[in-house]
């Protein structure tokens, strides 16, 4: 009986390690799409669209983002948008733009 329990424990540990590795890999892909490819600039780029791009499902996206950031998908996307907006607002290059225009350029869809 002890060997059976030990075997099951090792099997569970293996599954957990695989899950962690897959979660890490998916998070890297999420960051690649959002941060590097700047897909967040599209106001309609949803978790569902990201899941389609990554050949997974939106639930996995939500779980992985939550595990790695403590936030949800929308908070992650808005974080990227806010960083861009802050950078643009500080830049003399964008001094002639309104806050609303900058927000729209950063992927926000409205003034709300």
Regions found by a protein language model. Give the residues of each.
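The DNA-contacting recognition helix of HTH DNA-binding domains
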Residues: 58, 110-112
